[in-house]
UniProtKB/Swiss-Prot annotation:
Coiled coil: none annotated. Belongs to the xylopin-like family. GO terms for molecular function: toxin activity. C-terminal amidation is important for activity, since the non-amidated peptide shows weaker hemolytic, antibacterial and antifungal activities. GO terms for biological process: defense response to bacterium; defense response to fungus; killing of cells of another organism. One of its GO terms (cellular component) is extracellular region. It comes from Osmia rufa (Red mason bee). This is Osmin. Its main location: secreted. It is found in: Secreted. Keywords: Amidation, Antibiotic, Antimicrobial, Cytolysis, Fungicide, Hemolysis, Secreted, Toxin. Synthetic peptide exhibits hemolytic activities (less than melittin) and inhibits bacterial (M.luteus and E.coli) and fungal (F.oxysporum) growth at micromolar concentrations. In the context of inflammation and cancer tests, is weakly cytotoxic to normal cells, induces calcium signaling but does not impact cAMP production. In addition, prevents LPS-induced nitric oxid (NO) synthesis but does not affect the IP3 signaling and pro-inflammatory activation of endothelial cells. Does not show significant antiproliferative activity on the breast cancer cell line MDA-MB-231. The keyword Iron-sulfur does not apply. The keyword Metal-binding does not apply.
Amino acid sequence: GFLSALKKYLPIVLKHV
């Protein structure tokens, strides 16, 4: 689901910021 993808990619995005 969308939330599953969000939880999966959000930490990755935060690391790149």
